[in-house]
């Protein structure tokens, strides 16, 4: 059985696993494969949280020695419509992202990878992301792309490291649980 830390908060289960960064990168990163998956998303290239990752947002992963992967497992009541996914996920995502950024700030040279935003980036509330007009990000201190934006396989991460399956909605309803996955590389 896989060893990881577990914590509960308001029905959400938080699971944490620390692994060797080099091993995680070799086993779970396939940027070309996942870039193709990301291209079908309507947010692709429209926010600084999404790929393609270019310029200063490119990361050299070689200096990192550990990767702390954090999963928020969110129970979903039966027959919850898919249309409610954002309203369920966003408050938990924002809390998890704040914690990831706090962890990043505590250790020099570390880097947080936040969760995929279901509605794109939400730091420019009310205005379009600066990426659309080819301007620099307005909130570089807050915006961190997700693991999948850098080509990490989250389904395999979830299965191999946390013994959980990535579930998908069916017939217009959400599955029995949803997950958010973030990380801090140090």
List where the protein language model places each region.
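Non-catalytic, low-structured ubiquitin/UBL-interacting segments
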Residues: 1
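Catalytic cores of enzyme domains
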Residues: 4, 13-186
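N-terminal donor/sugar-recognition subdomains of glycan-related enzymes
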Residues: 7
